[in-house]
Curated annotation (Swiss-Prot):
Record organism: Staphylococcus carnosus (strain TM300)
Keywords noted in UniProt: Ribonucleoprotein, Ribosomal protein
Protein family (similarity comment): Belongs to the bacterial ribosomal protein bL36 family.
Single annotated GO MF: structural constituent of ribosome
Any one cellular-component term (Gene Ontology): cytoplasm
Biological process annotations from GO: translation
Keyword tRNA-binding tagged: no
Name the record gives this protein: Large ribosomal subunit protein bL36
InterPro entries with a match to the protein in the record: Ribosomal_bL36 (IPR000473), Ribosomal_bL36_sp (IPR035977)
Membrane spanning residue stretches: none
Key word Ribonucleoprotein present: yes
HAMAP family with a match to the protein in the record: Ribosomal_bL36
Cleavable signal peptide: none
Amino acid sequence: MKVRPSVKPICEKCKVIKRKGKVMIICENPKHKQRQG
């Protein structure tokens, strides 16, 4: 999980979702997981 000020989809499988008011990216590739901090 990467915590970044700006999250962007890295590949086509990356999905942007919102959980508890935080923007997150979920993907099949675990390296692509990101969350806005």
